[in-house]
Amino acid sequence: MDDKYTPYGGGNTRLQIAKELFAEGDQRFAQLRVIVKEWPGDAQVITAHLVENELRADITFWEKARGVHQFRIELEREQQKPLTAGELNRELRARGLNYGVKTIQNFTFATEELAPVGPWLKSTQVNEVTRPKVSALLELGAKLGQGKAMREQLQVVMHQYGDALRLRAKSNEDLEAAERLPVELDDAALLADLQLAAVQELG
């Protein structure tokens, strides 16, 4: 496909299916009739893909968080102003994505503070445990005048966990299915190590 054209609003899925059918010998898909429209802006295209992805049962919390984060960046650039969580909620709803304000806040916190372990985050855990505890540590550091140092120490710990999980996933590629180790974030261990790092930072 020419670089100046891109599928829109679910087109990626349909295009992939058409390619597979053509590869199997179905000549009806040798050519496709398409409608060419003016580019509506990056923000609109991002939400169209998010709506498409919502139909997938396997879409992860992190994929949603990153998509909403990218949408926010593009929409703020287009509108030339920052958006509150409430405003972002309304913009997403207008485009068919019904994420609540608290969910959007969790997405934002994950992309800003939990990115090193992002691919292994679970929605419920972030909402009920991880975000409240990490927020408390960050707030404590800020109150004691060590906000930047505290955040850096917490990021070091999260990078260690993220690197270990990526290494395990890579090692699993060379193993039979029955031999593979689960690649899951141990939330309790992570939070314990984050708290220890915070204590050490504060002395």
Segments from the language model and where they lie:
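Short, charged/polar connector segments at secondary-structure boundaries
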Residues: 1-32
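Aromatic/hydrophobic pocket-lining residues that form π-stacking "cages" and hydrophobic walls in ligand
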Residues: 18, 68, 194
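Accessory, typically intrinsically disordered or conformationally flexible segments
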Residues: 1-5, 141-145, 149-203
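Residues at alpha-helix termini
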Residues: 20, 90-94
